[in-house]
UniProtKB/Swiss-Prot annotation:
Substrate binds at T17, R21, S112, H113, K125, D280, R281, T343, E362, E363, S364, K375, R495. Mg(2+) binds at S112, D276, D278, D280. Binds 1 Mg(2+) ion per subunit. InterPro entries: A-D-PHexomutase_a/b/a-I, A-D-PHexomutase_a/b/a-I/II/III, A-D-PHexomutase_a/b/a-II, A-D-PHexomutase_a/b/a-III, A-D-PHexomutase_C_sf, A-D-PHexomutase_CS, Alpha-D-phosphohexomutase_SF, PGM. One of its GO terms (biological process) is glucose metabolic process. This enzyme participates in both the breakdown and synthesis of glucose. Required for the synthesis of capsular polysaccharide and normal lipopolysaccharide. Belongs to the phosphohexose mutase family. This is Phosphoglucomutase. It is an enzyme of class 5 (isomerase). The lineage of its organism: Bacteria, Pseudomonadati, Pseudomonadota, Alphaproteobacteria, Hyphomicrobiales. The active site is at S112 (phosphoserine intermediate). Its EC number is 5.4.2.2.
Amino acid sequence: MIKTIKTTPYQDQKPGTSGLRKKVPVFAQENYAENFIQSIFDALEGFEGQTLVIGGDGRYYNREVIQKAIKMAAAAGFGKVLVGQGGILSTPAASNVIRKYKAFGGIVLSASHNPGGPTEDFGIKYNIGNGGPAPEKITDAIYARSKVIDSYKISDAADIDLDKIGSFKVDELTVDVIDPVADYAALMEELFDFGAIRSLIAGGFKVVVDSMSAVTGPYAVEILEKRLGAPKGSVRNATPLPDFGGHHPDPNLVHAKELYDDVMSPEGPDFGAASDGDGDRNMVVGKGMFVTPSDSLAIIAANAKLAPGYAAGISGIARSMPTSAAADRVAEKLGLGMYETPTGWKFFGNLMDAGKVTICGEESFGTGSNHVREKDGLWAVLYWLNIVAARKESVKDIVTKHWAEYGRNYYSRHDYEEVDSDAANTLVAILREKLATLPGTSYGNLKVAAADDFAYHDPVDQSVSKNQGIRILFEGGSRIVLRLSGTGTAGATLRLYVERYEPDAARHGIETQSALADLISVADTIAGIKAHTADSEPTVIT
């Protein structure tokens, strides 16, 4: 039976770059999750009798909200819900299920790489029928509705058994609990040369993947160990846990340091990779070589034809604005379209739907293609294994040869986390005021060529997104980018991106922070980061 429950609105349900993210105690407030889910449904139209996909990354509070979402979908008039067994669906797998079964859309429960647990992070994101995150016009409508909502509808049916694959009824709604891995693994087998990768592994090439007690564990075990023949135990931390084992499921050099150290040790594996909370990010490490996400995007694009699913070539490349320009040099050489977008995977969706790009990437360890409409951690890992198998070269050799051909973009990101929001906003406001005066100014050997606050003009729907990050570009291809992140839940995160282009192969072996030292110093001179943040050093350097 459908019940209508009176409620009062919350004023803080504004979705960020990847949905609404808050601490669990916030989501556990009376009607908080229900209000937001109802606001999603109220902002949509035309879903009567249609299919909705629901799944999450297994974090704390995932199961409870899934039950609420199913009952509210029944009350809203959806015809069918597809939900992952155990409430599990990685974000790229959810995107694939939406596309494969022509669903109306999907509710993805995740806070991505943020920690999980009773006092940690939770998130709700709506994905549209193409499998990608809802564009701003929809998230703006959801937010507007959430501020005035006065009731929600929900079925009073019993909870369904999420652990049992099969078909269930909730009032008039059919709920299919599906194997969360099967469709995704089948898609990967279509895109990549599993035979070549299997032979590589059988020949003694040792692969280790750290799933960080998050959602990709079951996917990586099925694909790497069962289908590609990697020894049992090659996938570490393979069981998804509500608190990710007490760890921060963010695949970078801080939170995946154990994996990095293992691959770099003399007797360690040849190849290591890690993925994040919901499976959309990746870190790739070869013996003696950490691959930056910006380089990874460029190298995958340059070698795209080596994978069967991309043998006909790619139509174009897109990258987020803070991502290094390494991919631009590949696009230029191969005669491909190159698009620079704001941070947030949703901006790539239009470009992929319009056939303008095939491969996309972000510096924040996100890479993907038009096979789904989300970034995809395991996809990137398998692409690298396919390239290694096809070229019969080590990761280190592949990267250094790429630099020799295209030049090296020295690149680093400095994160200042949990900065006082007012201080961070003041820093950005003061810097914005300065921008017009910077071009022509010299700082040592660095001369400012241009400075702006990045605005994106979408070539597909003509929409404009302003204030997407401050760029200071120097003559010769170096640049500094500053932006506030929209994915954390405590304070503000100020991100500084520093990049220097080096065409001379004889100068490709410099330690990254040393190669960028003058730019890092100039960034502080121009922006006054230390003065505004009270942090003399970044929290994380990538």
